[in-house]
């Protein structure tokens, strides 16, 4: 009988090489699975997060309304900042159902958690748990108001804007590994994302008189500055803290989403409806694709 089997009772160099490679792969798989991945049904029990430690406050206090507006400066936007702060405060209050303190914080947290799980990609992200939310205390500050030169509309106004606040979000989730089988393992991830700074120029375009759906258009510059601070923990038993690539990925995704939605159209009462404006936007996008 010929002795040309791959495996035999007498080990050969080829057999030893194959067994050695397999043992290394098995060892690496065990290290990844038992140190960093979590195969339990409740990953948060084995990878608890100290939310009080992750939640950072930078000590910003609410800005008080100015006692005197700068009436002598024609380019001052302080009057608009007063209005903008009031509008932002109303949105914060609505998100909290008008309730102060811990009760209002819990309502805002639940709403954001429900929305996050509604839009999450369920194929590779487990349930998202929001631990805490800080809605901030400030509002964007506008300054250096000016009329744009050589603009299509003679009344286009441009501002410079800056926004620094305590806005932050702490959450936990798991990245799902579906190979070689569905939900083979989970990689627990805990994040705290905070706004450090946002800067951009903002353009306000008045409605066109001849437009069938007149709207007020607000857009930010595509060259805006966005700085986020992230605190991260990855892993189950052995944890990786503050992975730089994860910070870069989060900042890139937030920038991409903000750039894609950099233009807002405000429907003017009595001149157009939301449905009409949406149809007009779809038509503009179709014309842009054809051209």
Curated annotation (Swiss-Prot):
Describe its membrane topology: Single-pass type I membrane protein
- Pfam families in alphabetical order: MMM1 (PF10296)
- List the stretches on the Cytoplasmic face of the membrane: 38-291
Residue limits of the SMP-LTD domain?
Answer: 73-277
Question: What is this protein's function per UniProt?
Answer: Component of the ERMES/MDM complex, which serves as a molecular tether to connect the endoplasmic reticulum (ER) and mitochondria. Components of this complex are involved in the control of mitochondrial shape and protein biogenesis, and function in nonvesicular lipid trafficking between the ER and mitochondria. The MDM12-MMM1 subcomplex functions in the major beta-barrel assembly pathway that is responsible for biogenesis of all outer membrane beta-barrel proteins, and acts in a late step after the SAM complex.
Give the primary localization class: endoplasmic reticulum
Q: Does the keyword Zinc apply?
A: no
Species this protein is from: Laccaria bicolor (strain S238N-H82 / ATCC MYA-4686)
GO annotation terms (biological process): mitochondrial genome maintenance; mitochondrion-endoplasmic reticulum membrane tethering; phospholipid transport; protein insertion into mitochondrial outer membrane
Name it: Maintenance of mitochondrial morphology protein 1
Q: What is the lineage of its organism?
A: Eukaryota, Fungi, Dikarya, Basidiomycota, Agaricomycotina
Is Membrane set as a keyword in this record? Answer: yes
Family from the record:
Belongs to the MMM1 family.
Q: Tell me where it resides.
A: Endoplasmic reticulum membrane
Question: Which InterPro entries does this one have?
Answer: Mmm1, MMM1_dom, SMP_LBD
Pull the Lumenal topological domain ranges from the record. Answer: 1-16
Give the multimer and partner information. Homodimer. Component of the ER-mitochondria encounter structure (ERMES) or MDM complex, composed of MMM1, MDM10, MDM12 and MDM34. A MMM1 homodimer associates with one molecule of MDM12 on each side in a pairwise head-to-tail manner, and the SMP-LTD domains of MMM1 and MDM12 generate a continuous hydrophobic tunnel for phospholipid trafficking.
Tell me which UniProt keywords the record has, alphabetically. Answer: Endoplasmic reticulum, Lipid transport, Lipid-binding, Membrane, Transmembrane, Transmembrane helix, Transport
What does the comment on domains in this protein's record state?
The SMP-LTD domain is a barrel-like domain that can bind various types of glycerophospholipids in its interior and mediate their transfer between two adjacent bilayers.
**Molecular functions per Gene Ontology:** lipid binding
Kindly state one GO CC term assigned in the UniProt record.
Answer: ERMES complex
